[in-house]
Amino acid sequence: MRPSRRAPDELRAVSLERGVVKYAEGSCLVKFGDTHVLVTATLEERLPPWLKGQGRGWVTAEYGMLPRATLERTRREAAAGKQNGRTVEIQRLIGRSLRTIVDLQALGERQITVDCDVLQADGGTRTASITGAWVALADCLAWMKTRNMLKGQVMRDNVAAISCGIYNGTPVLDLDYAEDSEAETDANFVMTGDGRIVEVQGTAEKTPFSQDEFLALMALAQKGVARLVDLQKMAVA
């Protein structure tokens, strides 16, 4: 039995609320159960120096957690003077995931920065961030389209992410913190709307996992991502 009493293939309650920030070109408040992330997408008429003059744009991401997003206060990274390795890893993952489904040529010579700020963390902050980031980016591109700023279709597909793991010997979908902290194996899957794999991160926490167990986790992830993609489409409809 899962601590949340969910079925093995059951997502937490997921919501994707578009257009929640007044000033941002795109935004989304994403909730995976008790994990809540505020995502904004900001259009900037500038590019990294190494991209100038190439006729294409860029999508990048930043990620952070509020001090009391966790059970005990976490010191702000700005106060520490540097980002920790986990933060850097996650924001690079978010940026990579979004760029796989964006036509950077169609975007033109401009940059969209996606900021993911974790308001409350209960497991799966990176997967919630990626899923909400797609909605915020779509919201930003819709804003640009109404102003005739785009050459063509920028978004090629959806992209979403979900965690899976082996908990008490059973493959389960969408781990919360209670499960994640006790799981024998946990993995994050980033996939496109048509089911292609963008990235897989998997770790055996206690004992190695078999190929069959990995395939069982991937099957759960495919089911979960398909549901998330449906919710994304509803959010931007």
Curated annotation (Swiss-Prot):
Reaction equations catalysed: tRNA(n+1) + phosphate = tRNA(n) + a ribonucleoside 5'-diphosphate
GO molecular function: 3'-5'-RNA exonuclease activity; tRNA binding; tRNA nucleotidyltransferase activity
InterPro entries assigned to the protein according to its UniProt record, in alphabetical order: ExoRNase_PH_dom1, ExoRNase_PH_dom2, ExoRNase_PH_dom2_sf, PNPase/RNase_PH_dom_sf, Ribosomal_Su5_D2-typ_SF, RNase_PH, RNase_PH_bac-type, RNase_PH_CS
Top-tier EC class: transferase
A Pfam family per the record: RNase_PH_C
CDD domains: RNase_PH_bact
EC number(s) recorded for this UniProt protein: 2.7.7.56
Keywords: Nucleotidyltransferase, RNA-binding, rRNA processing, Transferase, tRNA processing, tRNA-binding
GO biological process: rRNA catabolic process; rRNA processing; tRNA processing
Top-rank lineage group of the source organism: Bacteria
Residues engaged in binding phosphate: 86, 124-126
Family in the record: Belongs to the RNase PH family.
Binding partners and assembly: Homohexameric ring arranged as a trimer of dimers.
PANTHER family per record: EXOSOME COMPLEX COMPONENT, EXOSOME COMPLEX COMPONENT RRP41
Job of this protein: Phosphorolytic 3'-5' exoribonuclease that plays an important role in tRNA 3'-end maturation. Removes nucleotide residues following the 3'-CCA terminus of tRNAs; can also add nucleotides to the ends of RNA molecules by using nucleoside diphosphates as substrates, but this may not be physiologically important. Probably plays a role in initiation of 16S rRNA degradation (leading to ribosome degradation) during starvation.
Listed name of the protein: Ribonuclease PH
Source organism phylogeny: Bacteria, Pseudomonadati, Pseudomonadota, Alphaproteobacteria, Hyphomicrobiales
